[in-house]
Curated annotation (Swiss-Prot):
HAMAP family named in the record: HrcA (MF_00081)
Family affiliation: Belongs to the HrcA family.
Recorded GO MF terms: DNA binding
Top-level taxonomy: Bacteria, Bacillati, Mycoplasmatota, Mycoplasmoidales, Mycoplasmoidaceae
Gene3D superfamilies in the cross-refs: 3.30.450.40, Winged helix-like DNA-binding domain superfamily/Winged helix DNA-binding domain
Organism (species): Mycoplasma genitalium (strain ATCC 33530 / DSM 19775 / NCTC 10195 / G37)
Keyword line: Repressor, Stress response, Transcription, Transcription regulation
Function (record text): Negative regulator of class I heat shock genes (grpE-dnaK-dnaJ and groELS operons). Prevents heat-shock induction of these operons.
InterPro entries: GAF-like_dom_sf, HrcA, HrcA_C, WH-like_DNA-bd_sf, WH_DNA-bd_sf
Domain of life: Bacteria
Record's protein name: Heat-inducible transcription repressor HrcA
One GO biological process term: negative regulation of DNA-templated transcription
């Protein structure tokens, strides 16, 4: 990444702060009036042209002003300086977390809701629980065509799976499978179930009427570990529609699909596991150029991991978001150690 002079860095930061706040291309006139009263408009235009030439800014087609490029945002993220406003938010977040004694999951949810209300962007909370142990499988008949499987873990988490059936023979196969599962894989870690499925298939083959139906509709869907391992909640999804970048229905639909894509959050978890801090991933790495994702992984004394990810337009307030996520990670891990030492 090319170096900037101190003045160019300050001009870039001012432009990005303005664009984050108002989503309007920034011109030299505004910069002179609001940020650099000691600089002439000509000097600012020259510096902005230099920033554009270096790839940090780009021109807007419908305005004479400039907007940040992805290179500009990446530089901005690397040279963040925490402001007094951000310090105040961090203090408020700490008070929310520590205001009363709660479980780790409850404290995380309190922190997520606080961040969600402050930044007005969706927050994705993903709990990775591949080390959960299966304790029970229950079956609930919904109607003549659908049944609901309830997979209950040792920690009390319940994973729900809806299975369809077309006739009495398929329904009988569902009942047979539940009996076999409860006999054979109870007290097994979810991450180890797939290793036992090959043995189960041979047992099931001799018991059921429609073996291929069982494979496709029950085994494939019931033990989809991507869904079980990544238990996901999305907070504040309504804020997306308020962002001008997502006013187009097609773009909004695309980002909503991204939020529901479990593989994306597993990819983010790998990045966070490798680099134990708050990470910023720009949209071109996820196949969607107009977004960014800020995320962090919270490690607790239990083997479950909690990932927080904030999804927004490329112009989102990285300074504030990064500070809040980092603070939440540090405070939750500190709180977890404290309550663990008390037990």
């Amino acid at each position: 990444m090319k170096n900037l002079t101190p003045r160019q860095a300050q001009i870039l930061k001012a432009i990005i702060n303005e664009y984050i706040a108002y989503a309007i291309p920034v011109g030299s006139k505004l910069l002179t009036k609001k940020y650099f009263k000691n600089l002439s408009g000509g000097t600012l235009r020259n510096e902005m042209a230099a920033l554009e030439k270096k790839g940090f800014l780009k021109k807007n087609h419908i305005s004479s002003g400039r907007v940040p490029s992805q290179i500009g945002y990446q530089y901005y993220v690397k040279v963040l300086n925490v402001s007094n406003t951000t310090n105040d938010l961090k203090t408020r977040l700490r008070s929310v977390i520590l205001q009363q004694h709660k479980t780790i999951d409850e404290v995380i949810e309190l922190g997520v809701k606080f961040i969600n209300e402050i930044i007005n962007l969706p927050v994705v909370l993903t709990n990775f629980s591949s080390d959960e142990v299966l304790k029970k499988i229950d079956l609930i008949i919904l109607d003549k065509s659908f049944a609901l499987f309830l997979l209950v873990s040792a920690s009390g988490k319940v994973f729900k799976k809806t299975i369809s059936y077309a006739n009495q023979r398929q329904f009988e196969d569902i009942v047979i499978c539940v009996r076999i599962f409860n006999d054979r894989i109870i007290d097994t870690r979810f991450s180890e179930i797939n290793n036992q499925l090959e043995v189960l298939k041979e047992i099931i083959r001799t018991k059921v009427h429609e073996y291929q139906y069982v494979i496709d509709e029950i085994l494939f869907k019931l033990f989809d570990l991507d869904q079980i391992e990544a238990n996901k909640k999305i907070y504040g999804i309504q804020y997306l529609a308020k962002q001008p970048e997502f006013a187009n229905q097609e773009k909004l639909t695309k980002i909503l699909n991204l939020l529901e894509d479990t593989s994306v959050w597993q990819q983010m978890a790998f990045i966070n596991q490798t680099n134990q801090k708050t990470n910023i991933v720009f949209g071109d790495q996820l196949g969607f150029k107009e977004i960014s994702v800020a995320s962090t992984l919270i490690n607790t004394t239990s083997e479950a991991k909690h990932q927080l990810a904030i999804v927004g337009p490329t112009r989102m307030d990285y300074q504030k978001i990064k500070a809040l996520l980092t603070t939440l990670k540090e405070e939750i891990e500190k709180y977890d150690k404290k309550i663990h030492n008390q037990t």
